[in-house]
C-alpha cells in the first residue's frame, strides 16, 4: 500500500507523503536538492530534470498525486510546458480547438502557429 493511501487530511498529506529520511544530517523534513546533476548509482533510474525524475520532482509529484487522489503526477518547468503537454497528449489530427479571445498569448501562439502542422485547426 502506498503512503498516499494512509494519510487523509490535506495538511497531513502535504507534510508526510513523499517524505524521505535525511540520512546525512538527520533533518526532520525531506531535504531540498538544489542540484541538477546526480550520481547514477542505480542504472535503472535516469535522473535528469527533463525526465521529471530529480528527487525534488519525485517528492512533489507524490504529494500532488496524493492530494489529487490520482495514480501519478508529473512536474513540469513552466505553465507552457504543462499546457503543451496536456494538449499534445489528447489531441489528434482532425480534432478542433476552441479558444477564448483573451487566452494567454503564448498558448494562442502555440495553438495557431504550431498545431496547424499537425492538422489541428483553431
What are these regions (language model features)?
Residues 67-70, 91-96, 116-118:
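Short, surface-exposed connector motifs at secondary-structure boundaries
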Residues 31-32, 72-74, 95-96, 121:
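Structural motif
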Residues 2-32:
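Short conserved active-site loop signatures built around small residues
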Residues 52-56, 99, 103, 122:
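Catalytic cores of large soluble enzymes that bind and process phosphate-bearing ligands
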Residues 89-107:
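Conserved PLP-anchoring active-site segment centered on the Schiff-base-forming lysine
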Residues 24-27, 65-67, 89-90:
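Solvent-exposed alpha-helices and their adjacent loops that cap or buttress functional pockets
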Residues 112-122:
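PLP-dependent aminotransferase-class I/II
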Residues 33, 37-84, 106-113:
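Conserved N-terminal alpha-helix of the aminotransferase class I/II PLP-enzyme fold
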Amino acid at each position: 500500500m502506498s503512503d498516499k493511501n494512509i494519510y487523509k487530511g490535506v495538511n497531513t498529506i502535504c507534510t508526510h507523503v513523499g517524505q524521505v529520511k535525511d540520512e546525512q544530517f538527520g533533518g526532520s523534513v525531506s531535504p531540498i536538492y538544489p542540484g541538477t546533476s546526480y550520481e547514477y548509482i542505480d542504472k535503472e533510474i535516469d535522473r535528469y530534470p527533463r525526465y521529471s525524475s530529480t528527487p525534488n520532482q519525485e517528492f512533489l509529484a507524490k504529494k500532488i498525486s496524493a492530494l489529487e487522489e490520482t495514480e501519478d503526477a508529473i512536474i513540469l518547468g513552466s505553465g507552457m510546458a504543462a499546457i503543451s503537454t496536456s494538449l499534445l497528449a489528447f489531441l489528434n489530427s482532425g480534432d478542433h480547438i476552441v479558444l477564448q479571445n483573451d487566452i494567454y498569448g503564448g498558448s494562442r501562439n502555440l495553438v495557431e502557429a504550431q498545431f496547424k502542422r499537425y492538422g489541428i485547426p483553431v
